Amino acid sequence: MFDLVTVDAVDSVALAAFWATSCGLTEVEREDDGRWIVLAEPATGLRRLGIQRIGGLLPAQAAWAGDRKARIHLDLRCGVGEIDAEVARLVSLGASVVRSSRDETYGRIVTLADPEGNLFDLCAYG
């Protein structure tokens, strides 16, 4: 069982703010210089997401080309009737749509990138 998922960032403070607002998480840990920030679900302290500041080109920025995907990404869940509104909310927070809404056998999916280019899918299962 994993403890948390870590996302690499050039601006860890800004990216942590994006993910905290996007997923309803709160900051539970931060190194003084902001190099390492941990977010978690407020009620339980679970669903931990680490944001780690690095330098240079991020793997997700280098990995996406045409139909190739980054090797790992997050899946966020929303209700079937909520996907368009949720995409609009995420875009207003700084995300960008990488691949438009599409139907898969397990539900409707939209691929987005966070403000630093890390890919994630918004999934409406059902």
What are these regions (language model features)?
Residues 32-36, 104-108:
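Short acidic/glycine-enriched loop/turn segments that link adjacent beta-strands
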